[in-house]
Amino acid sequence: MTHHRRRWLRRSVIGLGAVVVVAGGAFFTVGPGMVEKSMNKLDPGRPSEPSREARALHARLLVVDMHADTLMWDRDLLDRAVRGHVDLPRLREGGVALQVFSSVSKSPKGQNYDANTADSDNITLLTIAQLQPPRTWGSLLERSLYHAEKLEQAAKDSGGALMLIRTKADVDRLIAARRAGQDVTGALFSVEGLQNLEGQFDNVARLEAAGMRMAGFTHFFDNEVAGSMHGVDKGGLTDLGRRVFDAMEQRGIIVDLAHASHTAMDEMLRRATKPLVASHGGVQATCDVNRNLTDEEIRGVARTGGVVGVGYWDAAVCELTPKAVVDAIEHVIKVGGIETAALGSDYDGAVTVAWDTSDLAVITQELLDRGHSEEEIAAIMGGNTLRVMRAVLPD
């Protein structure tokens, strides 16, 4: 090899190495944010500004949202973000008294509402790209434990502005603080799909110790505890699932029906001795999507004393408007009673919405326009969910 060719080869290798370094740096520093920005969108068709009357009423409410996937993304909850739907500054602007933060541990490739297998996962690459601890790269349990740690650390760093909710007493303290005029926001840790148990019953206790106080049994695929509405078999509870269900009720962990198959949901509703929730979704009567609840399922939730959280994205309500959201809420009321209606946004859950958490007064405006009383609006916007939390959470 000639001296000229060796020098050319050396330069080529150095140049290729530089390209790899730059590409790798972009993957780890820019990539995760670009992915989130492309998945958690705000539709440009923003609703009209709420009236002064609606804003004044909204400020008096105890607003509760039962589902946001914010912990999945590489953002500081305490800082205002230029992407996504939820952070503490926007929660405060939206008058949110309590936000349920869910841990998403696995998402299948080609995810859809009809049928997904469990043999692929999009979250693994995301955990690596975000430079999460290596223990999370191959363990669904460790991913959820890491999400719980993120939430706990945010509360510690917030100077009291973000308060972890784990007991009935915590709920009471939050309500008292809000009514005393303190700008404090509650945060309850949930998980979306008990695939993070990794088939081990004892992991319920590990997640409980980390702060889990609500859990959906499935996400987009069948797992070791239950069939998913979007799985292949769509079966009911497994033997492990029944043990887990009973243990959750005994331990004061709220059972979430979201994403469960109709068979699994029916079994859980019949097995329940405490209120159950469907944390986020819609109703088939106003938006005929398979993940949404039938009237009989709404009645089943109501019979347990639970609540149905209505979301704001297209698959939940079919239109990105406050009207569509309140149409679904009013159907829940018609079938299950006023005490069954609640909110469950699915913010930051790879969905497009027309308003983020800072603009929740648009729902209050729509409810007001429909002639609902302040007492009814207070129940829908959060009072019903707080009642369920006080009924189920441990002392």
Q: What is each residue range found by the language model?
A:
Residues 2-232, 288-343, 347-395:
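N-terminal hydrophobic targeting/anchoring segments and the immediately downstream early-domain regions
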Residues 216-219, 224-295, 309-317:
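Active-site core of metal-dependent hydrolases
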